Amino acid sequence: MKKTKMLSLLFAAALLTGCAIAPSQSKESKNDGTSQNQPVSTPNSEGDKTSGGGNTSQGGDNTSQGGGGQGTEGAFTFDETELNTPQEIHTTDQKNYLNFSKPYYSITGSDLNSFNATGASSLQKSSWAPKSVTVNWGFTAPSGKTVSKFQFLYGQYSDLSDAYTIEGTTAQKISFVNPYLGDNYFKVVANFSDGTKEESPIKIFKVDTQAPRNLDVGNMPNCRDMGGRATYAGGKIKQGMIYRTAGNKFDNRSSIDSDCQTVLTKQLKVKTEINVANSTGNNVNLSGTNVVNAFMAYGATPYSNLARNSVRIRQVMDVLADESNYPVFYHCRIGTDRTGITGVMINGLLGVPFNEVIQDYGFSNFSPIDNQRYPGKTPDNNGDDIKKYIDEILAMPGNNFQEQTYNALLSIGCQPEKLNTIINIMTEGTKADIQIKGVVGEGSTLSSTGNKKTSTDYKNPATYYECSSGKEVSLTSSFTAGEKDIVVYLGGSDANQSTKFANCVTLKIDGAEQTISNSKTLHTAGFGNTQQDSRIGYMFNILGKYTLTAGNHTITFSVKSGTFNVGTLSVFDHIVASSN
């Protein structure tokens, strides 16, 4: 998709989107004749109504922003000091949580309680919703004119080609929710009773830049924009592109209300819904959206969590690698567990620093999610928690959490081209230049004495080898000298709790057998019935750390007992993240 079309999608999500930019910068303007939309009504966090709508494209009205003090712009006046003072959208409790002084990976229930982030089902909207912002102006009507109403238009771009219109009254102020983080371009339109209008110049009001941009989406809790955060590389994640939300029947009984539908369709302009719950009953099914069901397992057998959901994670990444699918919202039921897993993978891939990845996960505790969630805490005592997923990623080689996430995704069969596409779509400013630190051998490229199979079944990788006793797969490539992590991504149906995985397989380098340091049993490695529909349990497994000399080498993985489906065989440079 061309850049102008990409911007169209961003503009269409204007009310609940935005991007924090430096005060000295202006977003690129766009004049493509954006279509008109009907006015809509949405609630703010205090329960009153503000009506909006009409994605009005004014095209290139790039009036200078003006200086400080009280400024007169024709009949309009604005307090520049007020406009340039960032407004806060987070409540006191939310802000205190976001400024927590300790690593979020070690946060406790007591810590969360101190912020009133209890996750209790009794939490009200005032706990999770953002605060409203207010913009004031002065206006003197020309002689003989009577103001019938004001309209307030704002957007991310300096020409307001992405503008979202809020229908006001005759009051010379507007209060509303879901502004952008950072700079918001706006103008005011005075509508006179005789049908004529007068417009103010385009100005800027500011909102505090601290993410997340939590959202007021009708009666749906736990909603926020994935954008607005800085990355390891120095860029910033675009807002208005990916949203994490709850699903329909989020409390097992309530359907989303009309305000929620309005926000999602008329304001966010969502095009694609990804349901990562385990039931279509949580589908929102908005008119005009494409629904992708990527049902993820959670709870039950909580081992090899990342890999047992690998097929579904790849499905999510495939959706995000297609620009035509944006804006996207994804959810499970309450937007915390499976949604949290997905959020960790997306934030990690995009280069959000590790501490902020966990911070975003924990922000869900301001919503009624049944009970608290934090690393090490198992929801409903089901034996699963986000820490198991994160620890699998942290075990991968990489200089930081982004590289570790990238390599983990490669190891479960994601294509590097698609991962890079997602990074490019979602990043503004400096983009991460991730170089694969090793060789990933997909099933289609491996040499094998096993039975090669190509499958469109979601239970298996697209191409894999079925290897039983005496069968093998091998990868021959040129390597740089140094320590390497050898990783195999495979599935198996045997979930024996005492049989060691290392006793069932063999690893050779140039024909010489190697010691496998992995000490997991087949059960703890995640094999067997660990996903829905009795699917085979896929996992990635680090076999160990090995030293290679520079030049060509052949890595061979073979089966001594049992049967395994081999999806990838990967060799990564051994890199330990010094800091996340």
Which residues does each predicted region cover?
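Extended extracellular/luminal ectodomain segments enriched in beta-structured repeat modules
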Residues: 480-489
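Glycan-recognition and processing domains
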Residues: 20-30, 74-110, 432-480, 569-580
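Sec-dependent bacterial lipoprotein signal peptides
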Residues: 1-17
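Extracellular beta-rich ligand/substrate-recognition surface
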Residues: 115, 451-473, 494-499, 528-537
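Beta-strand-rich ligand-recognition modules
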Residues: 491-552, 559-574
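Conserved structural position at the C-terminal beta-strand
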Residues: 190, 557-559
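Cys-dependent protein tyrosine phosphatase-like superfamily
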Residues: 69-328, 341-437
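Ser/Thr/Gly/Pro-rich low-complexity, disordered linker/stalk segments of secreted
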Residues: 23-73, 449
